[in-house]
Design a protein with these regions (language model features):
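Bacterial N-terminal signal peptides that target proteins for export
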Residues: 1-12
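Extracytoplasmic small-molecule ligand-binding "clamshell" domains
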Residues: 27-91
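Periplasmic-binding protein-like
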Residues: 29-38, 44, 110-118, 196-236, ...
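Short loop->beta-strand "edge-of-pocket" segments that line small-molecule binding or catalytic clefts
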Residues: 31-38, 44, 127-144
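Ligand-binding clefts/hinges and TM-proximal coupling segments of bilobed small-molecule sensing domains
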Residues: 62, 141-158, 162, 232-278
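Short helices/loops that flank or line small-molecule/ion binding pockets
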Residues: 72-86, 99-100, 128, 168-184
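A structural signal for short loop-to-beta-strand junctions that line the ligand-binding cleft
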Residues: 100-109, 204
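Pocket-lining segment of extracytoplasmic ligand-binding domains
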Residues: 122, 131-223
Length: 278
């Protein structure tokens, strides 16, 4: 009898929750900002604290910063609707917009490029030196890795082993430790490396300007769109926002240009294939 009562109460709770208005059912849920894992989780949580606090105050809700072990897992979480606001590079933003109804809001003014880096001493001097060696990148679905792999193919590099790691600072440290001949990182992450790390590295190749980190809002937060956009712009004008943008060399927010995300479709398609979506 006790078992039956528990079962009845459990079903009743589920039914009751389903009958509640949407706002009431999710009233206690925090607003989750999912940051693509371009660097270590510790650094991401620290880096985005000013934004978290500003949005919490502006929206009047609890705000959490979350990330993922790698770009592939991040994409899966975003597709599974784990984030209210996703901050990820243009190719994943395009996927989320085109296939999963996320709404693009803003990107950063600072140029975003993918870099192929090597060490000052002992690294490859040109693309042909990378054949038969190990090159270090982020996950197979990260923009810098996808562009870097295309660059290797265009350059005629053969028999290259790609080793995937979780963060840009790990790429740099592994190169300096002699565990790879070259690596793929973004320009912003390269600029954020410690000066003593940067001096041991050099840029072998760089991409044209690409669409970097884009803020895309989950469709379930459509009613909050105007408030979220206003909060982002006010953050950029606040003292803490200006410090954040200057410290991370981001220059500020800007609106996306017409067709800018659509131009990332070839890279978005590679993510689809990697995730088994086509």
């Amino acid at each position: 009898m006790i078992s039956n009562l528990r079962r009845f109460l459990g079903v009743s709770c589920v039914v009751l929750q389903a009958l509640l208005p949407l706002g009431a059912a999710g009233a206690t849920e925090p607003f989750k900002i999912g940051i693509a894992p371009h660097t270590s989780a510790r650094f991401i949580l620290e880096q985005y604290q000013p934004l978290r606090m500003h949005l919490a105050k502006a929206l009047g809700v609890e705000v959490e910063i979350v990330t993922a072990p790698d770009f592939t897992d991040y994409a899966r979480q975003a597709i599974a609707q784990k984030f209210d606001l996703a901050v990820t590079t243009g190719h994943q933003a395009r996927l989320l917009e085109a296939d999963f109804r996320y709404m693009p809001l803003v990107t950063y003014k600072a140029p975003f490029k993918s870099l192929v880096i090597t060490t000052q001493k002992g690294g490859g001097r040109s693309a042909k030196d990378l054949s038969g060696t190990t090159v270090i990148g982020l996950s197979p679905t990260s923009l810098v890795t996808l562009w870097g792999q295309h660059w290797l193919n265009r350059s005629g590099c053969k028999d290259v082993t790609i080793r995937y790691v979780s963060a840009a600072d790990s790429v740099a440290q592994l190169l300096l430790a002699g565990e790879g001949t070259a690596g793929f990182v973004s320009l912003p992450n390269f600029q954020n490396l410690a000066p003593e790390v940067q001096t041991g590295l050099r840029v072998l190749a760089e991409s044209p300007a690409l669409t970097g980190r884009v803020y895309v809002l989950n469709a379930r937060q459509r009613a909050r769109r105007a408030a979220v956009e206003a909060a982002l712009w006010s953050f950029a004008e606040s003292a803490e926002g200006k410090r954040y943008l200057e410290k991370n060399k981001l220059e500020g927010y800007r609106k996306l240009k017409k067709g800018e995300l659509a131009a990332m479709e070839p890279f978005a398609d590679e993510v689809r294939r990697s995730l088994g979506l086509k």
